[in-house]
Curated annotation (Swiss-Prot):
Pfam entry (one): F_bP_aldolase
Catalytic activity: D-tagatofuranose 1,6-bisphosphate = D-glyceraldehyde 3-phosphate + dihydroxyacetone phosphate
Cofactor note: Binds 1 zinc ion per subunit.
Annotated dihydroxyacetone phosphate binding sites: G181, G209, A210, S211, N230, V231, A232, T233
Pathway(s) per entry: Carbohydrate metabolism; D-tagatose 6-phosphate degradation; D-glyceraldehyde 3-phosphate and glycerone phosphate from D-tagatose 6-phosphate: step 2/2
Name the record gives this protein: D-tagatose-1,6-bisphosphate aldolase subunit GatY
Length: 284
């Protein structure tokens, strides 16, 4: 009962006018901070992992950790495959118990994107697994995938409806001006495009590349239909910078149980702020 699909989470968010944050985890400490903070704020959250994260930690290990922590805190959690591209990889993880998948075929031409996504949807829905897909493509780097800004393109609102109907997806990730990674300057988000997409598509919408966005921008996207906010780089940066600072100030430190506390504290600040920005505190 504790490891759940994201479908009900996102449908609840759509009805309630808030968003559910999906935090990309990279190690045990990241997961601890996300779950502990979410439980203390009674907020729904999604534990997301790229293919690199699942390779690093092991699918069975991640599933066991999420299940154990959900039970420990009596807090339902979803574990989500972020930016997965290979059908066989997705199928193996679904059979291991994952109940939320993002199939990313956004780099393919429109018809091929539909075909690849529909194959995954048809398989996943047999296991009551929710499926997210992306139309349009964000710039920046996610895991081992690098997309140059010149190759990034925005979601076409009319195509979005055709894509959603043809694939049977449960949520749609849109490209409206965000990018993976942190921003050198504030991005100019295309809110009118997002509003048009919302008019064409009634599915929960997903925003990738939210690290570093202002509270105002995040909350405006939620008003216009975003139900899931993805955060990865902001957590990594908080962790690594706090750790570097601590070890610079305490070069004699050798015990990870001590020096990782500063990194956890920095991530806790990020997680609590994102939950507040999403308006999901008290919604679990």
């Amino acid at each position: 009962m504790y490891v759940v699909s994201t479908k009900q989470m996102l449908n609840n968010a759509q009805r309630g006018g808030y968003a559910v944050p999906a935090f990309n985890i990279h190690n045990l400490e990241t997961m601890q901070v996300v779950v502990e903070t979410a439980a203390s704020m009674h907020a729904p959250v999604i534990i997301a992992g790229t293919p690199g994260t699942f390779t690093h930690a092991g699918t069975e290990n991640l599933m066991a950790l999420v299940s154990a922590m959900a039970k420990q805190y009596h807090h339902p959690l979803a574990i989500h495959l972020d930016h997965h591209t290979k059908f066989d990889d997705i199928a193996q993880k679904v059979r291991s118990g994952v109940r939320s998948v993002m199939i990313d075929a956004s780099h393919l031409p429109f018809a091929q994107n539909i075909s690849r996504v529909k194959e995954v949807v048809d398989f996943c829905h047999r296991f009551d697994v929710s499926v997210e897909a992306e139309l349009g493509q964000l710039g920046g780097q996610e895991d081992d995938v690098q997309v140059n800004e010149a190759d990034a393109f925005y979601t076409n609102p009319a195509q979005a409806r055709e894509f959603a109907e043809a694939t049977g997806i449960d949520s749609l990730a849109v490209a409206i001006g965000t990018a993976h990674g942190m921003y050198a300057s504030a991005p100019a988000l295309d809110f009118s495009r997002l509003e048009n997409i919302r008019q064409w598509v009634n599915l929960p919408l997903v925003l990738h590349g939210a690290s570093g966005l202002s509270t105002k921008d995040i909350q405006q996207t939620i008003k216009l239909g975003i139900c899931k906010i993805n955060v990865a780089t902001e957590l990594k940066n908080a962790f690594s910078q706090a750790l570097k600072n601590y070890l610079t100030e305490h070069p004699e430190a050798t015990d990870p149980r001590d020096y990782l506390q500063s990194a956890k504290s920095a991530m806790r600040d990020v997680v609590s702020k994102v939950i507040a920005d999403c308006g999901c505190e008290g919604r679990a």
